[in-house]
């Protein structure tokens, strides 16, 4: 069943794009894992999240043809965060004559709310230009090289099912480590509550299909009954549904956990357990 659920996830994400239009305005989130990062497809909008650790971070673009270059610095709107992050755009290693200097120290940062992740930022300096082919470096730093930042590169929004899956992995980690809040806060995002709604709908659909199949092939046996669990079992399933949902939204926002939470609620609401049905077990009077 788990494999089948994973096959449904891209469709789930597509449904989220239909019901939550603000998703198409999102950058592809990335967590920077080293001091030097290669940036593929620089025109595609991406947001790199990192914290300076004593040295500058460098983002490298290798362009074989002209492209539209866009760079923007942001920092999280959290207590104690300094608005002192700057960046230098360099072409072909020409440090003496940089293309642009994004001076965050003397810039008037503006507050910015991003609905995709339901997060608040301070938006800093940006740079936009038509760039020729060549190698570009974006060097990010702060006076003490100890600040958190998000570096947005590219303006073309491209957010498909694959990127949706990546976002589900990245955003809970960003909530905890970058914005220093509980992953539960992601529920304020249309992507967050939309994921719960769609996975619950999917769980109910699977439940109805499974029940219909068992009833069709087991009309004259306990497996074919409409109800097969009593009140105590329904309460247990309700508790399981709540527990799985809380576990999911407070940790990784796993679609699988949310799906099984929805399935537990399905069993509780309709007094029917698929496992009991398969075994021919019944804990409530048959009407």
Where are these regions (language model features)?
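Mid-chain, structured segments of secreted extracytoplasmic proteins
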Residues: 69-112
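Hydrophobic membrane-targeting signal helices
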Residues: 15-23, 209-210, 265-274
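Beta-sandwich interaction modules
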Residues: 110-131
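C-terminal edge strands of extracellular/lumenal beta-sandwich accessory domains
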Residues: 27-36, 59, 85-93, 127-203, ...
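Membrane-interfacial helix-loop segments of redox and metal-homeostasis proteins
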Residues: 213-287
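Small-residue packing motifs within transmembrane alpha-helices
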Residues: 8-11, 16, 190, 194, ...
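N-terminal pre-first-transmembrane soluble regions of secretory-pathway and organelle membrane proteins
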Residues: 1-67
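Hydrophobic beta-strand segments within beta-rich accessory/binding domains
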Residues: 58-79, 136-142
């Amino acid at each position: 069943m788990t494999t089948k659920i994973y096959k449904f996830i891209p469709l789930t994400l597509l449904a989220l794009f239909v019901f939550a239009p603000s998703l198409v305005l999102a950058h592809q989130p990335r967590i920077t894992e080293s001091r030097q990062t290669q940036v593929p497809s620089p025109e595609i909008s991406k947001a790199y999240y990192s914290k300076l650790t004593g040295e500058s971070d460098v983002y490298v673009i290798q362009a074989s043809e002209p492209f539209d270059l866009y760079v923007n610095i942001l920092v999280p709107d959290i207590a104690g965060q300094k608005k002192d992050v700057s960046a230098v755009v360099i072409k072909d290693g020409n440090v003496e004559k940089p293309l642009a200097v994004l001076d965050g120290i003397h810039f008037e940062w503006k507050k910015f709310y991003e609905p995709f992740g339901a997060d608040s930022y301070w938006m800093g300096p940006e740079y936009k230009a038509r760039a020729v082919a060549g190698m570009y470096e974006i060097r990010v730093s702060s006076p003490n090289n100890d600040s958190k930042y998000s570096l947005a590169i590219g303006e073309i929004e491209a957010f498909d099912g694959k990127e949706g899956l990546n976002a589900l992995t990245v955003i809970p980690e960003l909530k905890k480590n970058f914005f220093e809040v509980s992953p539960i806060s992601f529920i304020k995002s249309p992507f967050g509550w939309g994921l719960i709604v769609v996975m619950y709908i999917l769980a109910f659909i699977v439940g109805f299909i499974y029940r219909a199949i068992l009833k069709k092939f087991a009309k004259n046996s306990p497996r074919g009954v409409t109800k097969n669990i009593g009140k105590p079992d329904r309460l247990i399933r309700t508790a399981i549904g709540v527990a799985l949902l809380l576990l999911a939204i407070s940790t990784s926002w796993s679609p699988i956990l949310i799906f099984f939470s929805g399935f537990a609620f399905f069993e509780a609401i309709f007094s029917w357990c698929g496992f009991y049905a398969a075994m021919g077990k019944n804990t409530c009077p048959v009407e």
